[in-house]
Structure formats: structure tokens, C-alpha cells
């Protein structure tokens, strides 16, 4: 996946200098290999810390949510953003703002739980904190990435009313109040149309209604 930095420790944690060197080499290689010298946007996982060996590791989002303190979460995200930026990572694949209504879902720990407002507040706080350091926030997975029964990325037949009242609201706040500069589409389909090419979600709602 061009543009995705994946930390490989090779048996030991990498220092900031080693991570930066690896990313710079990747950027140089990709830039030199295309006719327009276009560099990639380096992105990486940063759910509860920048993804390299000596970066700060914070609690999982489900634990952060238990603080009910969006200001503290914004400060945490600011630290994560700094540690991403110093290594050359310019896009963080976080926050996960899928509202969990069935804790059998294996990715529940990555979320802020079952409450719509809490998800929205925490997600927007993460977006603001990351982007203070020039790191693009990526709320995901847009939208309704899990289904009842705990099945990951399964077909969603959720009604539009429930989508708008529950599953879309955290994303809306991430865009309007968090200023999120990117969004990751969900892997599943909604109402028979894959979310990654769902015009109603990506154009009518995300762009036209929310102004993304």
C-alpha cells in the first residue's frame, strides 16, 4: 500500500532517528520512481500512540472514554500527533468513532463505547489534538462498520433514521467541530451499496450536508 508506513522493529524498538530515516528513504524512493516526482503521504496507525517502538503508549480508547474528559483526550491526541510528526508520519488512521451496540464485536476496545454523544465528543477531541501538529486525522469507519452479533465489516441494513441518530452523529461532529481532514470509508455495504463507493454517504451526506 503506497504511502503506508508500517513499523517493523526487527527484534528491537526503533529510535526516532531510525524511524525518520526509514520514512525518508521510502519517500525518496517513491518520489524518484514516478515521472512527476510526487511524494507519498506517509500514514500510520495511531489509535493510542504513534506506531513506532519508542513512542508513548496511552490507554486504549475504550479506557480513555471512561474518563469522560474530552479535554484530556485532546491533550493525549496532541502528544500522539507530535510523535507522529517528528517521525514524518503525516496522516493518522484514527479515531475509531463507530458506536458499539454489541460488545461481542472484536474491535470494541478500539472505540469510545456505546454512547453517541461520548463518541462524538471524544472523536472530535482526537481530531483537534492530532491536527494541531499538522497530522491529518482520519475518523473511521464511515459508516456502521459492524453489525449486531459482533460480526466485523458485515452487511448493514440499519434504517436511515438509526444511521442518522446513532452511527453518523460522531462522524458529523468530527467533521464540523473536529475539522477532520480525511475520512476512512467502511469495509461493509449499507443498504446494498458498498460504503467505499456509496454516493449517498460520501457525496450527499459527507460533502453536501456536512461541507467536508
Language model features with spans:
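Glycoside hydrolase catalytic-domain context in secreted enzymes
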Residues: 1-212
Amino acid at each position: 500500500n503506497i504511502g503506508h508506513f508500517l513499523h517493523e522493529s526487527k527484534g528491537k524498538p526503533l529510535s526516532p532517528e531510525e524511524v525518520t530515516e526509514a520514512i525518508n528513504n521510502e519517500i525518496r524512493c517513491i518520489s524518484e520512481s514516478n515521472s512527476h516526482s510526487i511524494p507519498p503521504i506517509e500514514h500510520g496507525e495511531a489509535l493510542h500512540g504513534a506506531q513506532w517502538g519508542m513512542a508513548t503508549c496511552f490507554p486504549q480508547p475504550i479506557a480513555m472514554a471512561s474518563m469522560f474528559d474530552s479535554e484530556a483526550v485532546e491533550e493525549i491526541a496532541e502528544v500522539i500527533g507530535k510523535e507522529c510528526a517528528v517521525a514524518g508520519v503525516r496522516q493518522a488512521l484514527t479515531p475509531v468513532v463507530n458506536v458499539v451496540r454489541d460488545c461481542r464485536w472484536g474491535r470494541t476496545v478500539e472505540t469510545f463505547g456505546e454512547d453517541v454523544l461520548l463518541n462524538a465528543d471524544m472523536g472530535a477531541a482526537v481530531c483537534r489534538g492530532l491536527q494541531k501538529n499538522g497530522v491529518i486525522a482520519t475518523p473511521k469507519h464511515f459508516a456502521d462498520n459492524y453489525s449486531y452479533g459482533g460480526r466485523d465489516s458485515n452487511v448493514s441494513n440499519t434504517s436511515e433514521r438509526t444511521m442518522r441518530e446513532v452511527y453518523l452523529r460522531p462522524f458529523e461532529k468530527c467533521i464540523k467541530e473536529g475539522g477532520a481532514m480525511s475520512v476512512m470509508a467502511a469495509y461493509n455495504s449499507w443498504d446494498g451499496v458498498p460504503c467505499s463507493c456509496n454516493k449517498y454517504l460520501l457525496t450527499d451526506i459527507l460533502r453536501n450536508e456536512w461541507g467536508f
